[in-house]
Structures are given as structure tokens and as C-alpha cells.
Amino acid sequence: MTDTMSKAVIAIERPARWAKQLGSHLGHKIAVAEVENGWSFTIDGAYGEALATGENELTLTATGDTDELRQRMEFVLQKHLLKFAADHNPEVVWH
């Protein structure tokens, strides 16, 4: 079994704020840790990060033991970001 990884780079103002909001909210549901420039998230078999990678750039990453687990992490991060930042209408495209 190999890890699969994807990444989404989102243009959004105050990316550190959105990373922190994801960390604060998801910390009640899954394992969350503060990392350099953002937050990491762990669900059984999947790992993700929300990082402020530029002045107006938030990078989300998702890794999973399987494609299904990676997609689960993508879904969780994307769903919550789109909910929190709805007024900013961020475009999330995973690669």
C-alpha cells in the first residue's frame, strides 16, 4: 500500500486565519496539531495540513493510506473551509 497525496492552493486573504479556524474547529472532532505556518490533521489512515504559504495563499494537503482515505481528508478540509469562508468564495481545486 502506498500513500497517495494531493494538494490545493487557494488564493484567499489572511490564510493563517483560515488555517487556525480549521484547526480550532476540527480539533473537537479529530487529532489536530499546530505546525509551522499552520495546522495538521489526522484521521485513521489519513493526514492533512492547512498552511499559510503566502501573503494571500492557503495550501491544503491530504495524504492517505489509500485513495479513499486521502479523498476523505480532502472532503473534510474543503467542506469546512468553504463553510467558514463562504463570503470569500474560495476556489478549491485538488491536484
Regions found by a protein language model. Name each.
Residues 4, 51-52, 79:
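Charged, terminal alpha-helix-loop-beta segments
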Residues 57, 61-95:
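C-terminal structural segments of small proteins and small subunits
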Residues 6, 36-39, 91-95:
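Structural preference for solvent-exposed beta-strand-turn elements
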